[in-house]
Every structure is written in structure tokens, then in C-alpha cells.
Regions:
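Active-site proximal beta-strand in glycosyltransferases
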Residues: 74-76, 92-113
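Nucleotide-activated donor-binding/catalytic signature segment of Leloir-type glycosyltransferases, i.e.
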Residues: 237-256
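Conserved donor-binding/catalytic core segment of Leloir-type glycosyltransferases
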Residues: 7, 179-202, 208, 223-225, ...
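A conserved mid-protein helix/loop that constitutes part of the nucleotide-sugar donor-binding site
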Residues: 13-20, 199-213
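A short, active-site helix/loop in glycosyltransferases that binds the activated sugar's phosphate group
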Residues: 124-177
């Protein structure tokens, strides 16, 4: 008999795609999905077993949540961002061992990112109590699981899973013949992408300064900078800085665009620079590496360690140059990305978690 599984999800851009996966591949199994957030921003079709609450601070939503948590065999927490949910679970310790946490990144690194005020210290007491008792931890970045063990003294099981469709490579399998044809076109300048969002953890200014020390006028065509997701005030500041430093070569992406349109931009990129000091931008990174793009990131991050472990070549930000990687590296990276970051692998990993 299949386990009854409850998904509690902070509603973000990853979740509608995950709901599609559940409906497509696990339709005959007893899954309930409760999301909380702005469904107008991240819409999906609701049903009796898959539905949204705008907040978790009403009696009705909390009551339905508590009932659902007790009726299901396993609870999967998609992102641990809601203070209401953390506190609520702390007062039901008998549920903790059947809870698995899908680590997103920002929720794990909360102690680094949050403002250190009274609210932070109170919440960290609740978080430490809850996280230390959880039954499972879901992430494909092994370093993040080890960080959870170190920071929160966890003992729960590690489930390796790429979890969301945003981590599934959406491009083509590359052939040597196609690459030879592209190289024959002799493009004189490279296009660069910096960061993946308007989050200060992108460290845009640091990346801009590193890039500006290279031969920007003669070797760079465009500098793409995705800023549509995150802090709008910070986005405006980075747009202004980028235009000041790179002039008409700077292309800030300020508005959300359809995935197909965004993928066309990824196709144009030759070199990507990610200056994050933690695991972040993995969806972008995966799809750029799969497309044969040269990716630079900090070598002290868990994402760098993961990709290196998978045999995928990434370069240290300290060694930034405008030379693109060899054809052999392009082919090898594409093959490894296609094999690991596939929907087939995702579904198999989910089957293990759900069993």
C-alpha cells in the first residue's frame, strides 16, 4: 500500500512545475499538496487534494494544516521559510520523524542571511529544535546536507534528489559535428551572463569588477544580467552600476519572460559568472553547463564541490578569463548533465523518497 504523503510548500517559481510532475507521474498515489503564498504570481490548477492558502495565520488554514499533518504518513517540507509553520511544528514533536525537509538554500543559510535582531534569535531557537529532530533531508548538494549536520546537529536520513523541473536540463544533446560547425562561424566576441537574480547574494559588484579588469571593449559583445527575480530596489541599483561600467554592452533582464525566451538567451551566452558565496542559481548553472557554456563560480561553495564530484568541469572565479572551454569539455559536460539532471532521474529519485 502506498504511503499517504503531504507536501507543504512555500509557493515559489519551482512549485507549479513540481505539481505537474506529481500529477503526471504519481497520479494514482495518495499525495496532498498544500501551498502558501501568492497563487496569482505562481499559478497552478487547484483541486480537492492540491490547493493554496494565501497565508498561514488564519484559524481555518492552521486547522486544515494540522489535520492534514496527522492524516498522512509522511510530510515533505518544500522550503523552510515560514515562521508560522516552524513554530507550529515545534509544538507537535511527535510529527518530526515523519517530516523530510527539501533544502532550498536560503532556508539553510538563514543564520548567515537574516538580520540579527530579536526576532532572528527567537526563530533560531525554534529552527534548531525542529531541524535537529527531522527524519529526512532532501538535496542533491551533499555539502548542504553536511552543513545541516554541522550547524543543526541533525541525524536524519539524506535523500539525494534534484527535486524540481528547474533542475532538469532543458536543452539538446550536443554533437561534435554541430560544435565544429559553430566554431567555423568564427564569432569574434563572447557574451557573458552575470548572476541569476536580483538577490544581493549574487555579489554583482564583485563580479562586475573582476570582469572589468579584462579586455571588455574588444572581446565582449553583451553582458546579460538577470534581475527580474528578487529585490527590486537592489535590481535598480545593479542596473545603474552595470550601465555605468559596461555602457551599451550591458543588458539587464528586468522583466519575467517565458522559459522558451529565457532559454534563447542562455543559448547566446558563452561565459557565465556566479559570485554567490553559497549554493544558489543551480537551475541556471545546470542549463548553461548542459549547453556547453563556460561557468565560473566560487570554489569554496557546496555547488562547486557537487559539480566537480559529478565530473562536470566548472572554473574557479579566481581564474576568470574570456577564454571558452575546449570542445572536449563541452561534450563531456553535456553528456554528464543530460544523464544526471534528467526528468527520468528526477522521477526515480522521487520514487525512492515516496516509498
Amino acid at each position: 500500500m502506498n504511503k499517504k504523503i503531504l507536501h507543504l510548500a512555500y509557493l515559489d517559481k519551482f512549485i507549479p512545475g513540481f505539481i505537474e510532475i506529481v500529477r503526471q507521474h504519481f497520479a494514482g498515489e495518495p499525495h496532498t499538496v498544500i501551498t502558501f503564498g501568492d497563487i496569482k504570481k505562481y499559478p497552478y490548477v487547484q483541486s480537492s487534494s492540491i490547493f493554496n492558502f494565501s497565508t498561514l495565520n488564519s484559524f481555518r488554514s492552521i486547522f486544515k494544516l494540522v489535520v492534514a499533518m496527522h492524516l498522512n504518513d509522511k510530510i515533505i517540507l518544500h522550503g523552510l521559510f515560514s515562521s508560522h509553520l516552524v513554530i507550529l511544528l515545534c509544538f507537535m514533536p511527535w510529527l518530526h520523524k515523519k517530516c523530510d525537509w527539501v533544502i532550498w538554500g536560503g532556508d539553510l543559510y538563514y543564520h548567515r542571511l537574516a538580520k540579527k535582531d530579536t526576532r532572528y534569535y527567537v526563530m533560531e531557537v525554534f529552527r534548531k529544535f525542529l531541524i535537529s529532530r527531522l527524519g529526512g533531508f532532501i538535496t542533491y548538494v551533499e555539502g548542504d546536507y553536511h552543513n545541516a549536520q554541522q550547524w543543526y546537529h541533525t541525524s536524519g536520513k539524506h535523500y539525494e534528489c534534484i527535486m524540481y523541473k528547474s533542475n532538469v536540463y532543458s536543452g539538446a544533446t550536443l554533437s561534435e559535428e554541430a560544435l565544429i560547425h559553430t566554431e567555423g562561424q568564427g564569432l569574434p566576441k563572447v557574451n557573458v551572463q552575470i548572476g541569476n537574480s536580483a538577490d544581493p547574494t549574487n555579489n554583482h559588484q564583485q563580479a562586475f569588477e573582476k570582469l572589468s579588469k579584462l579586455d571588455v571593449p574588444n572581446q565582449i559583445g553583451k553582458v546579460y544580467c538577470p534581475l527580474s527575480y528578487g529585490n527590486s530596489v537592489y535590481a535598480a541599483q545593479i542596473k545603474k552600476l552595470g550601465e555605468a561600467m559596461f555602457g551599451d554592452k550591458f543588458f539587464p533582464l528586468m522583466d519575467f519572460m517565458p522559459l522558451a525566451q529565457y532559454n534563447k538567451i542562455l543559448d547566446e551566452v558563452d561565459i557565465a559568472i556566479f559570485a554567490h558565496d553559497r549554493q544558489q542559481a543551480m537551475g541556471n548553472t545546470i542549463n548553461l553547463l548542459g549547453r556547453g557554456k563556460t561557468v565560473y563560480m566560487r570554489a569554496d561553495t557546496s555547488s562547486y564541490a557537487l559539480l566537480t564530484k559529478l565530473g562536470i568541469k566548472v572554473f574557479s572565479l579566481d581564474d576568470l578569463s574570456l577564454a571558452v572551454q575546449s570542445r572536449e569539455v563541452v561534450i563531456a559536460n553535456n553528456q554528464r548533465v543530460c544523464n544526471y539532471f534528467s526528468e527520468e532521474n528526477l522521477v526515480n529519485q522521487l520514487k525512492t523518497i515516496f516509498s
